[in-house]
């Protein structure tokens, strides 16, 4: 379970980025954080990860095995390491897996799942496409077997086919390894396919919180309706 109680945060004392955030996410629930750029979505993720401490309020996690997948994969990889080295580091550091044969078998299984060519393993991050690197980014996080995964705009560099492939993989992971994941996105179609609950942020405050089946409910907050209408166009 993840719980935020009256969380307020700002990068300086004069302006708060998040104000009085109250969220409870039980195990098994996948949540989408929806809102425009600058509303505080990524800051919220950083707080859950423990990268920052709230100015006020408390954050409780029942499981410390939390990882994130960021929007820009190039900054997440060591530029001097091959893709294979970066992936195997996750297996060693998070799972204590040192046997090369076992590591290779896991990599081959995941390459097939993510529809990626094994020849790409010898490449540096700068030598593969943005979409391929983002899929490797997701793969590396899943190889580490986190219990909670925070996904920050992870489909922004993917084409339609690769996007659906990643969505299917993440949904399958909730059945096997993940307790839940949090998806931060401005893309409503991604959230509709991935999560069962949406929290809407505006100007650092929660303005709406509902089950995905209630997205088009007449009782939705006016800002939520505005986002839905904008996406429809």
Curated annotation (Swiss-Prot):
<comment type="subunit">
    <text>The complex is composed of two ATP-binding proteins (NikD and NikE), two transmembrane proteins (NikB and NikC) and a solute-binding protein (NikA).</text>
</comment>
<dbReference type="InterPro" id="IPR027417">
    <property type="entry name" value="P-loop_NTPase"/>
</dbReference>
<keyword id="KW-0406">Ion transport</keyword>
<keyword id="KW-1278">Translocase</keyword>
<keyword id="KW-0547">Nucleotide-binding</keyword>
<dbReference type="GO" id="GO:0015413">
    <property type="term" value="F:ABC-type nickel transporter activity"/>
</dbReference>
<keyword id="KW-0813">Transport</keyword>
<dbReference type="Pfam" id="PF00005">
    <property type="entry name" value="ABC_tran"/>
</dbReference>
<keyword id="KW-1003">Cell membrane</keyword>
<dbReference type="InterPro" id="IPR003439">
    <property type="entry name" value="ABC_transporter-like_ATP-bd"/>
</dbReference>
<keyword id="KW-0533">Nickel</keyword>
<feature type="binding site">
    <location>
        <begin position="35"/>
        <end position="42"/>
    </location>
    <ligand>
        <name>ATP</name>
    </ligand>
</feature>
<dbReference type="InterPro" id="IPR050319">
    <property type="entry name" value="ABC_transp_ATP-bind"/>
</dbReference>
<protein>
    <recommendedName>
        <fullName>Nickel import system ATP-binding protein NikE</fullName>
        <ecNumber>7.2.2.11</ecNumber>
    </recommendedName>
</protein>
<dbReference type="InterPro" id="IPR003593">
    <property type="entry name" value="AAA+_ATPase"/>
</dbReference>
<dbReference type="GO" id="GO:0005886">
    <property type="term" value="C:plasma membrane"/>
</dbReference>
<keyword id="KW-0921">Nickel transport</keyword>
<feature type="domain" description="ABC transporter">
    <location>
        <begin position="2"/>
        <end position="228"/>
    </location>
</feature>
<keyword id="KW-0067">ATP-binding</keyword>
<dbReference type="GO" id="GO:0005524">
    <property type="term" value="F:ATP binding"/>
</dbReference>
<dbReference type="GO" id="GO:0016887">
    <property type="term" value="F:ATP hydrolysis activity"/>
</dbReference>
<comment type="function">
    <text>Part of the ABC transporter complex NikABCDE (Opp2) involved in nickel import. Probably responsible for energy coupling to the transport system.</text>
</comment>
<comment type="similarity">
    <text>Belongs to the ABC transporter superfamily.</text>
</comment>
<keyword id="KW-0472">Membrane</keyword>
